Amino acid sequence: MAKILVIGGGAMGSAFTVPCIDNNNKVTITEPYSKNFIRDLTSKKKFHSSLKLNLSKKLKFKKFSGDLLKEKFDLIVIALSLSGIDFIGKALKTSKVKTPLLVLTKGLKHEKKTNKIFTISEQLKKNYNLMNISVLKGPCLAKELARKNQTSVIIANRNIKIAKWIGKSISTKYYLIDFSTDVIGVEVCS
């Protein structure tokens, strides 16, 4: 059983909690800026307005803060939109987080100064000196995952043992996972 923090209460972050909880992990979710998702996640029934379903009663919600990031977690999942990557990168760097990170966010970032394109994992390493970053990508829709429809993803980390540990912690009969050491390739192809 792992202690997992999911940062981002949108559709994918919230849907991702379903297989995590089904795999007997202790899951906490936080939402840095959307009042709608905070309302959804703190309601008694935990009805998620985007997913159109009630999330597990086992799911804990905690207010986002630097202190929350300093708590002991086995895995921190980043499920923010691309525009939230700089925000969370700064927060994780400030909190001196050493916990393994799993990035669900899709997209590439164009750096105007150098006219280069970076993947999210490259950006987090380069700009915020964050290490031990895994990425999870695949043809997985949030609503399908939340409804436990069978879907598949790939977890990539240069250290395949970490990718496999994460996979073992979150895989279910409906959430099938493959692994790769090609982090950039998996990110670019998502």
Kindly label every feature range from the protein language model:
Residues 1-55, 59-63, 70, 111, ...:
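NAD(P)+-binding Rossmann beta1-loop-alpha1 motif at the extreme N-terminus of oxidoreductases
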Residues 4, 25-27, 99, 131-133, ...:
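Hydrophobic anchor at the start of a short beta-strand
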Residues 13, 83-86, 108, 161-162, ...:
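Glycine-rich nucleotide phosphate-binding loop and flanking beta-alpha elements
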Residues 28, 60-62, 134-136, 178-180:
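General small-molecule cofactor/ligand-binding pocket signal
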Residues 33-34, 108, 137-141, 159, ...:
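Glycine-rich beta-alpha junction loops
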Residues 55, 62-148, 166-167:
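Rossmann-like NAD(P)(H) cofactor-binding subdomain of soluble oxidoreductases
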Residues 95, 126-133, 150-190:
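Internal alpha-helical scaffold of NAD(P)-dependent oxidoreductase catalytic cores
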